Amino acid sequence: LKTILEYLDTPPYLRKKVYPKMWILKHAGVLPPIKSPHHKALINSKDIKDIEIRFGFVVKQNDSLYVDVGLQKLIRYNGTQLGKKVLVKISNKGKLLAQDISKEEIDGYWGYEVQLSDSLSALLENRNCEILMTSVEGSPFTKHVEDLMRSLKMSKNLLVVFGGPKFGLRKILESENERITQKPHFLNMFPKQGTQTVRLEEAILGTLSIVNNYLNA
């Protein structure tokens, strides 16, 4: 699952370079595109007038490093990450030059990262953020909107946690027999949902849309 998620986050023009033929990605072609801002279209290098930010893949050519960023030619790379996917800022000062840039330097959303945790309790422990745990067993979201938004404005960071297809968050925590010290917001994002459960992919999109709507209100 981690590989599939990382594959989806990779711009289409880089996927064949970053991911060789893998059985786990055999049916990845039928997955819907995410159309994230960093999934940019192929363009001509002549169209870069000032600054362009793109993901690329670093290769070596004639003892120099270049980065493939989905243009019709490779761009000279001022870095050291040979054979890796990199996020670069391309500047045009007579010649195109690419150098590393971090997501924190970019204004707006620029893709996600995938991390693995040994357990749910380990994921929740020592988090410097507000924690929203979604569950049909939680309190209705609409009754706690003000508290959650007030907390978010103070912390600036939010961890949203969803249950799995077979077990909800309460059962998962009970099975781990661990206590979490930080008090989370345990909320039902879809009260009166009319079904026993909400599909995970629908819950993710719905929850993020609801939270984003209130944050930008």
Segments (PLM) and residue ranges:
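Post-transcriptional modification and biogenesis factors for structured RNAs
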Residues: 1-217
